[in-house]
Amino acid sequence: MQGGLLQKCEHGRLMFNIDQPDSAPDSDDRDGDVTMHDGTMHDVTMHGQGSFFGRRKGHKLRAHQADLIEHLLPHLALQIGGPAPEPLTALFDPPIEHVRLEIGFGGGEHLIAEALAHPDTGFIGAEPYVNGMAKILARIEADNIRNIRLFAGDASELLAWVPAGSLARIDLIHPDPWPKRRHWKRRFVQDGTVTAMSRALAPHGEFRFVSDIDGYNAWTLAHLLRAPDFDWLAERADDWRKPWPNYTMTRYGRKAEREGRRANYLRFERA
């Protein structure tokens, strides 16, 4: 990977440098009050201990956005107080074949594009940030999208709720990198969440991760490569340097490119 992030020693084993400083721009260095650069796909972070970090609301909602939150969201929002339906595909009408999850969908660009491109797949979008939820609701209404359900809580709780082996794919795209060492425990990718994803994914299901922050890419690789249930689907450098086919670039991804930061695109298969 770029910048000496991933290296091979003389015996061919992968070596990681996760102690290097990251270049996440405009991050606030105050404990407990971190506001990331504008446009990130995941301005809020949750992890397996049930803790919540970040912000749930930004700019004041416009009148129509507030109306969507009040009237449309209740029809699409998942309530996880009771057991999940089995099969999980029963969440969707009309019937679908597979269910995928996107964690921290931000403005919803990638999730909307995937839902439109795959009408036979059901999508669950997890995003506690109210403004992001309002944006995606506007697109769902405008395009009459029927294969998206939404969850406004802790994604780790959602992973624990879905039946084992019920997800075909999990996407985590440009998550908050929490670049300061003392904040690394706030990153979504932790041993506990990797275990939770392993349980939720079907055999041969995929976890896909995108970030322009080298340190978080190395962190994610280190966690997934030591997980016994995941295989890294990369055979050559272009497999992580270039987006997979038909990938929809997000607003934050375009911003990162303009500022000279190249993203890495990591794919892991559930064994």
List where the protein language model places each region.
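Conserved glycine-rich SAM-binding loop
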Residues: 106
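S-adenosyl-L-methionine
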Residues: 6-101, 109-118, 137-165
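Conserved beta-strand/loop positions that form the S-adenosyl-L-methionine
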Residues: 101-103, 126
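Conserved SAM/SAH-binding beta-strand->alpha-helix loop
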Residues: 129
